[in-house]
Every structure is written in C-alpha cells, then in structure tokens.
C-alpha cells in the first residue's frame, strides 16, 4: 500500500462536488492541470510563493483554439492553493514576433537580489526571475524579472545572457547551490547529447563549468534537463544521507516510442555531476510523462516536488479533446530509497508519490478543494472465482469520473506455473454503459512472471486509427516484502477522466497513461476478479474512493 510522505498527507484520499457534467468536456481531467483553452506542453518555471502561499506553474502555450503546437509559443500561467485546483491567468511571457517562441526554462526566487533587479518594495519571497530559451533565428538563453509576483515579466535589456551561436541549445533549469554559493544552470545542447552546466553569481554572467555528455539512453536528442538533491529514506549509514539526481528528457527515441524521461544518481560539487554508475533509469515507464520540472522555493518539509507534461509527441497534436489539448501529471513528491531490484541485488531508486496535501492545507482545512463522496474498503479477502470485488459509482447517474484505489496483496501460492492453472488476476476500470456499450481499462497481474500488464484499448476512433498510441504496456515488479503467507506487492492508482497514474510498490515504479473513451463515457466502476477455483491471491487491504470538488 502506498504510504505518502508525512508532509503530504492528511488522508491522501481527500479530494472534488459535482465535477463538470460528464456530457460536456467529458475528457477533461478534473484534478490535473489543463489549459482553459488552446495548446499546452512542457511545464516551465514553477515556484512556491511563501508569502502568498501560492503555487505557480508556467507552461509552453498557444491559446489559439485550434489547440495544436504552433508559433507564437508563450508561457501560459496557472496558480493553485492546493496543487489540485488551478486558476488560469493567460500569458505571462510572450515572444517579440509571431513566428518565434519563448521556449522552456525555469523560474527562481532571487531572495537576496543577486540580480539587482529589485528594491525593498518587492518582498524577498516574490523576487521572481525567469530563465528561458528565446527561439528566434538561434536559440539563446535569456532572463526576465517580475515586479507583480510573477503575473507579468520585464525582459532584461542586455539579453541574451548565453549565446553559443546554436539553434539547438535550450531548456535552462536554474537552482541555487549553497555549497558553492552560486546559481547553477543545466541546459541541453540537444543534438550533441550534452547537458551543459553553467555557474553564475547574479543570473546575468554565466561561466561554463562542465559537460555531462552521451550518458544513458540517447534517443534522438536531449531536452529539459533538471538537477536536484534528494534525501535517502533508508540510508545505509550516517555519512551518505542524500544524493544528487540529474534528469533528462529524450524525444523521440523512448523504448515505447516518442517521449520519455530518464535520471542519473550521483554527486554534484558545484562544477561537475559525477554519476554513481552508467545505468539508464526511467522516471515513468508509461507513454505520457515528459519534460519533468521541479518547483523552486519549496518549504523544507515539502521536499522536492515536481510534475511533467502528461502526453507524448507521437500523438499530442491529435488527441480528441475540445478547444484544448494536454494536461500535466499530478504533482509528485520525490525521494530516494534502496529497494530490491531482483532477488540478489538492491539499489537506489527514485520514489514518487502523488501530493494531495501540503503544509498549508494541513494547517487550513478551508484551502482544500476536494473530498471523498463514495468509498469502498475490503481486507483479508482470499480472491478466487467465487469471491471478487465490484464497485459502481454511477448508481445515481452522477459519477465524477475521478477515483483512486490503494491495493496491498499477497501471492500465497509460490509454486504456481503449470499450464493448466490460472496465474493471473485482474483489476478492471469500467465506464458507464452508453447506447448499450461499455469500455474497460485492464490491469492484470501475472504471478508467474510477477508482471503487471496494462491495456488501455478503447473504441474511440482516435485510438483505433493511431498505430503509435501503444495500448498495451507491461512492467516487471519485484516483491516489496515476504511474510509467512507469501510475497507482498502494492499498487496505488489515480483515475481522472482520461488519465491513469499508477504507482507500484510504494512509488518505486511509476506509470502514466492517457486514454480516451468515446460517446461521453467516463470511468465509473472498479472491479477485481480472478478466474480460478483455487485462491492464490489474498487482498490484504483495498480501498477505492470516488473524489469530487467541494
């Protein structure tokens, strides 16, 4: 069972009253950030305003209702009090010309006014500086500052701050490095497979420190790098209690096709990132998680928080939504943990857990915008052909299409594997029945191979006519524990209209996938089934909760 870090939770399962009518915009997620209208892709500058207690997300945007990627590309802007309900504020940064773009970048809180852009009239917690790629004839790195808490920006009159005469250097991510007392930028030299590391005292003058080159899974190009320091949940000693993580996005070239994020664990000394090994580790093994970015200026108890674009460049421009395209993933909390990777080895792994509660919402209940409206729980159920779990949130025809499930189960028969025996059980997410038809997402666990199979096949014409949508995906999982009864596994999932986020074994593996039911259908019921005369799975704990806006 996924257990959220202390910062995050009051019941993880608090979350939305009558979410939008299922007959209108039925594919729009309700607890994931989406644009009010137009196109959205990479998350850009993201920060927490500690004074106003407000979360800011900028994103690649074109508000044109055609809802496809096209210039001019702007920075759209949304804010939230609780990371689940978002207010849209239009464009915050725009290019000089309509055939150009303000490409991806980041935002920092320049609390000590190292840039010299601010005076005492601007609160230190609201000294906002954006660092971005200006995409004109070349790609140059530029900066802008805000005097109104991040709602608009003034471009630096001596831009660019970095110009290497390249059309393929972009996506600067900037952070403050205490140990070397300087700003650090990681930026992609995309088609040379380089992450370039720069340092600056003032966000204006930058010196190249080192290059992280040709590491991991290359794909076609590197994009959207990131760098942060994370605590280790279960350190092996008192000496090493944290590690640095460098992140990369690659597109195209994912093993599943299109877009994916990978990460490296190591050390950073203010000049060079030193990876612990050469292994390729993927952040999220689904099809719809790209261009991850972390928040700047989070509270210490909030830890490292971030989100990603929940789509894939293979089909992002053609998904069947109305007047808008794309959503972000849920905000996730990030740590590191030693986990078993197979029966004989263990290693540090990125742990991801969705954020439903922050320091402020724990202190002030009125900030919460979500609640549980229906719930179902079962414990110690021996699953077989005659015993199953079934829930239906559409009995009053007012289902929200948003629910979560939290499952812990034990494989009690470890000697299975004969061809005449069932070795699988399934979790099924059903739509309501419309015009005599129902659609289903399938999550099947095979005990013989300890593998989850996910099938997001629907009858929507978009999916039927999109050969690159990759409807069937699988992942091996190692047991999370062993008891006298058998091997233990966990799975936490969030279903939100057209997006499914899965967190296996307490968040050591994450998988994000979109799906598109047709004819106004939304997810309304959840079922657990095993077609076996003999029980080999015990559901230790299962909770399913339907969520709605207050």
From Swiss-Prot:
<dbReference type="GO" id="GO:0000324">
    <property type="term" value="C:fungal-type vacuole"/>
</dbReference>
<dbReference type="Pfam" id="PF00251">
    <property type="entry name" value="Glyco_hydro_32N"/>
</dbReference>
<feature type="glycosylation site" description="N-linked (GlcNAc...) asparagine">
    <location>
        <position position="119"/>
    </location>
</feature>
<keyword id="KW-0325">Glycoprotein</keyword>
<dbReference type="InterPro" id="IPR018053">
    <property type="entry name" value="Glyco_hydro_32_AS"/>
</dbReference>
<dbReference type="InterPro" id="IPR023296">
    <property type="entry name" value="Glyco_hydro_beta-prop_sf"/>
</dbReference>
<feature type="binding site">
    <location>
        <position position="223"/>
    </location>
    <ligand>
        <name>substrate</name>
    </ligand>
</feature>
<feature type="active site">
    <location>
        <position position="42"/>
    </location>
</feature>
<feature type="glycosylation site" description="N-linked (GlcNAc...) asparagine">
    <location>
        <position position="398"/>
    </location>
</feature>
<keyword id="KW-0732">Signal</keyword>
<feature type="binding site">
    <location>
        <begin position="170"/>
        <end position="171"/>
    </location>
    <ligand>
        <name>substrate</name>
    </ligand>
</feature>
<keyword id="KW-0378">Hydrolase</keyword>
<dbReference type="GO" id="GO:0004575">
    <property type="term" value="F:sucrose alpha-glucosidase activity"/>
</dbReference>
<feature type="glycosylation site" description="N-linked (GlcNAc...) asparagine">
    <location>
        <position position="165"/>
    </location>
</feature>
<feature type="glycosylation site" description="N-linked (GlcNAc...) asparagine">
    <location>
        <position position="112"/>
    </location>
</feature>
<dbReference type="Pfam" id="PF08244">
    <property type="entry name" value="Glyco_hydro_32C"/>
</dbReference>
<feature type="binding site">
    <location>
        <position position="313"/>
    </location>
    <ligand>
        <name>substrate</name>
    </ligand>
</feature>
<feature type="glycosylation site" description="N-linked (GlcNAc...) asparagine">
    <location>
        <position position="211"/>
    </location>
</feature>
<dbReference type="InterPro" id="IPR013189">
    <property type="entry name" value="Glyco_hydro_32_C"/>
</dbReference>
<feature type="glycosylation site" description="N-linked (GlcNAc...) asparagine">
    <location>
        <position position="364"/>
    </location>
</feature>
<feature type="glycosylation site" description="N-linked (GlcNAc...) asparagine">
    <location>
        <position position="113"/>
    </location>
</feature>
<dbReference type="GO" id="GO:0005987">
    <property type="term" value="P:sucrose catabolic process"/>
</dbReference>
<dbReference type="InterPro" id="IPR013148">
    <property type="entry name" value="Glyco_hydro_32_N"/>
</dbReference>
<dbReference type="InterPro" id="IPR013320">
    <property type="entry name" value="ConA-like_dom_sf"/>
</dbReference>
<feature type="binding site">
    <location>
        <position position="60"/>
    </location>
    <ligand>
        <name>substrate</name>
    </ligand>
</feature>
<protein>
    <recommendedName>
        <fullName>Invertase</fullName>
        <ecNumber>3.2.1.26</ecNumber>
    </recommendedName>
</protein>
<feature type="glycosylation site" description="N-linked (GlcNAc...) asparagine">
    <location>
        <position position="333"/>
    </location>
</feature>
<feature type="glycosylation site" description="N-linked (GlcNAc...) asparagine">
    <location>
        <position position="420"/>
    </location>
</feature>
<feature type="binding site">
    <location>
        <begin position="39"/>
        <end position="42"/>
    </location>
    <ligand>
        <name>substrate</name>
    </ligand>
</feature>
<feature type="glycosylation site" description="N-linked (GlcNAc...) asparagine">
    <location>
        <position position="237"/>
    </location>
</feature>
<feature type="binding site">
    <location>
        <begin position="103"/>
        <end position="104"/>
    </location>
    <ligand>
        <name>substrate</name>
    </ligand>
</feature>
<dbReference type="GO" id="GO:0005576">
    <property type="term" value="C:extracellular region"/>
</dbReference>
<keyword id="KW-0326">Glycosidase</keyword>
<dbReference type="InterPro" id="IPR001362">
    <property type="entry name" value="Glyco_hydro_32"/>
</dbReference>
<feature type="signal peptide">
    <location>
        <begin position="1"/>
        <end position="22"/>
    </location>
</feature>
<comment type="similarity">
    <text>Belongs to the glycosyl hydrolase 32 family.</text>
</comment>
């Amino acid at each position: 069972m996924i257990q959220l870090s202390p910062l995050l939770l009051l019941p993880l399962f608090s979350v939305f009253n009558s979410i939008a009518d299922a007959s209108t915009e039925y594919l729009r997620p309700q607890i994931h950030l989406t644009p009010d209208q137009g196109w959205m892709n990479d998350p850009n500058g993201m920060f927490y305003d500690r004074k106003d207690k407000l979360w800011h997300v900028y994103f690649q945007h074109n508000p044109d209702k055609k809802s496809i990627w096209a210039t001019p590309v702007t920075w759209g802007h949304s804010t939230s009090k609780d990371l689940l309900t978002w207010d849209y504020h239009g464009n915050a940064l725009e290019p000089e010309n309509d055939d150009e773009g303000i490409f991806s970048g980041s935002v920092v809180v320049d609390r000590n006014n190292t840039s010299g852009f601010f005076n005492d009239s601007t609160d230190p917690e609201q000294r906002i500086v954006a660092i971005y790629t200006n995409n004109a004839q070349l790609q140059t790195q530029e900066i802008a500052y805000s005097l109104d808490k991040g709602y608009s920006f003034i471009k630096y009159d001596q831009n660019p701050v970095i110009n290497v005469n390249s059309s393929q250097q972009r996506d600067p991510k900037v952070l403050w490095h205490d140990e070397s007392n300087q700003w650090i930028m990681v930026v992609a030299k995309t088609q040379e497979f380089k992450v370039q590391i720069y340092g600056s005292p003032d966000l204006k003058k930058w010196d190249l420190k080192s290059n992280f080159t040709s590491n991991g899974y290359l794909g076609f190009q590197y994009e959207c790098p990131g760098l942060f320091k994370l605590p280790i949940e279960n350190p092996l000693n008192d000496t090493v209690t944290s590690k640095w993580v460098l992140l990369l996005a690659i597109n195209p070239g994912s093993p599943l096709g299109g877009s994916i994020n990978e990460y490296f664990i190591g050390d950073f000394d203010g000049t060079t990132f030193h990876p612990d090994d050469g292994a390729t580790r993927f952040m999220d093994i689904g099809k719809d998680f790209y261009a991850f970015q972390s928040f700047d200026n989070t509270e210490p108890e909030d830890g490292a928080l971030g989100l990603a674009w929940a789509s894939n460049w293979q089909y992002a421009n053609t998904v069947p939504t109305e007047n808008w395209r794309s959503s972000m993933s849920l905000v996730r909390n990030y740590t590191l943990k030693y986990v078993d990777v197979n029966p004989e080895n263990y290693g540090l792994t990125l742990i991801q857990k969705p954020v439903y509660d922050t320091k402020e919402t724990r202190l002030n209940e009125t900030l919460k915008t979500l609640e549980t409206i229906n719930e179902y729980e079962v414990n110690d159920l021996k699953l077989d052909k005659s015993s199953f779990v079934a829930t239906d949130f559409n009995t009053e025809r007012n289902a929200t299409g948003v629910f979560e499930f939290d499952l812990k189960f034990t494989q009690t028969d470890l000697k299975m594997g004969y061809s005449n025996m069932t070795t699988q059980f399934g979790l099924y997410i059903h739509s309501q029945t419309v015009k005599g038809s129902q659609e289903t997402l399938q999550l099947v666990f095979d005990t013989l191979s300890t593998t989850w199979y996910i099938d997001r096949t629907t009858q929507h014409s978009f999916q039927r006519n999109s050969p690159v949508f990759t409807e069937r995906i699988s992942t091996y999982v190692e047991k999370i524990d062993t008891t006298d009864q058998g091997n233990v596994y966990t799975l936490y999932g969030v279903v939100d209209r057209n997006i499914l986020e899965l967190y296996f074994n307490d968040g050591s593996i994450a998988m994000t996938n979109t799906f598109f039911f047709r004819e106004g259908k939304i997810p309304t019921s959840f079922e657990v089934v095993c077609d076996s005369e003999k029980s080999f799975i015990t559901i230790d704990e299962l909770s399913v909760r339907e969520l709605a806006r207050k």
